Amino acid sequence: MLLHDVAITSMDVAATSSRLTKVARIAALLHRAAPDTQLVTIIVSWLSGELPQRHIGVGWAALRSLPPPAPQPALTVTGVDATLSKIGTLSGKGSQAQRAALVAELFSAATEAEQTFLLRLLGGELRQGAKGGIMADAVAQAAGLPAATVQRAAMLGGDLAAAAAAGLSGAALDTFTLRVGRPIGPMLAQTATSVHDALERHGGTTIFEAKLDGARVQIHRANDQVRIYTRSLDDVTARLPEVVEATLALPVRDLVADGEAIALCPDNRPQRFQVTASRFGRSVDVAAARATQPLSVFFFDILHRDGTDLLEAPTTERLAALDALVPARHRVDRLITSDPTDAANFLDATLAAGHEGVMAKAPAARYLAGRRGAGWLKVKPVHTLDLVVLAVEWGSGRRRGKLSNIHLGARDPATGGFVMVGKTFKGMTDAMLDWQTTRFHEIAVGPTDGYVVQLRPEQVVEVALDGVQRSSRYPGGLALRFARVVRYRADKDPAEADTIDAVRALY
């Protein structure tokens, strides 16, 4: 199969807002690829915006200057995948030049449509509305299977592409079960506006836990073998010896647990998230980092113990099993209550300890691997900033034809200009998209038919964010975490926008 077929399908999927049409287009492509398991795996990964190789060391810098496109499609899907694998294996002296040469060779053989697809895929910008449920439905349609069967296999296998390859080759998906050593998708939380809201949504009584601002880890132990996975299912065992040692100290043979790795100060207050995140880098000197930035691990759920799966067990039963196994120093603080005052006090104490909020877990909730359910709710304070829109990108998928992803700038009193601190396309309603498309045309600087439209720095926008982290991507050295639009501020002049110092104060 040619890369051209995948690129055209991606364009078609991005061009329609109809879920049924998206599913049908992807299913048709997968049906053509079946029963070739390698081909199916690659296509599902790519159209989900991911690479089977996960990381290949190619960033935007390597994609800035591209050769002219090829006149006719000739690249095959498997051939491109092989090239990407080769790029990902390069390391050491001269590898950057080799990587650049292979990228140039690949793009010179790609047509304009194929270049666009590869550019967005490698840059992490393939927003076409085909992730998650839509892709699972497409796999189910192509394989002639119930969507729930595909979703469960993907959930327990931790990989929709693997489930798709099995289903489209005629293999039974009921063989996908929780297996020690094979990561599964983590359960995710919805948001509650307050502890009172969480109590109401959980029927009056719930279990509150401290929400640590660390890194989610999934811990697998089979006898004396331990594997540690991130929330994106990357294996980081070698980078986290402290987590391995804490797991081996538990009186258990086989284990699958959910937890948080976090760097703490000497007084047990959390370090900035960036300190914890630095321990997960692929090139980190583990011994040196451990000496200067040691990690602690806190377990908060247990999914399997010594031959017994606990996914279907209620929260209370899983926590009882956790408490019987893990010492208190390795568990998060917890409160079971129906009293809003007690819940509010617990939240206040958690925030005072330096943590980011609380989780509320319904006592009867099952562990919904890979899904965002109401059984878990997160409650945390929200920071807001008034920033200036510096540029905007054209949308894709449902937002095709709309100016969508906005570039955000903080005011720099020293220069009188603005410093970019992030981007976001989150939180925008349809009405807001319509309004800003018109508004940004009015304040555009230069042409508006390119991917990025530059703007006069006149429009103030209020954004909510979860915090700030260090970043070399932006000139201010900082980036917003999980920024989303609250509203546009017609009542505010750019001179009233928050300064870069206000952003730094949140770090």
Swiss-Prot record:
The keyword DNA damage applies. SUPFAM superfamilies: ATP-dependent DNA ligase DNA-binding domain, DNA ligase/mRNA capping enzyme, catalytic domain, Nucleic acid-binding proteins. ATP binds at E209, R216, R231, E260, F300, R372, K378. One of its GO terms (biological process) is DNA replication. It catalyses: ATP + (deoxyribonucleotide)n-3'-hydroxyl + 5'-phospho-(deoxyribonucleotide)m = (deoxyribonucleotide)n+m + AMP + diphosphate. Its EC number is 6.5.1.1. Residues 1-172 are annotated as: Not required for adenylyltransferase activity, required for nick joining. It is an enzyme of class 6 (ligase). Keywords: ATP-binding, Cell cycle, Cell division, DNA damage, DNA recombination, DNA repair, DNA replication, Ligase, Magnesium, Metal-binding, Nucleotide-binding. The active site is at K211. The keyword Kinase does not apply. GO terms for molecular function: ATP binding; DNA binding; DNA ligase (ATP) activity; metal ion binding. Its cofactor is Mg(2+). It holds the Pfam family DNA_ligase_A_M. DNA ligase that seals nicks in double-stranded DNA during DNA replication, DNA recombination and DNA repair. Belongs to the ATP-dependent DNA ligase family. HAMAP family: DNA_ligase (MF_00407). This is DNA ligase B. The lineage of its organism: Bacteria, Bacillati, Actinomycetota, Actinomycetes, Mycobacteriales.
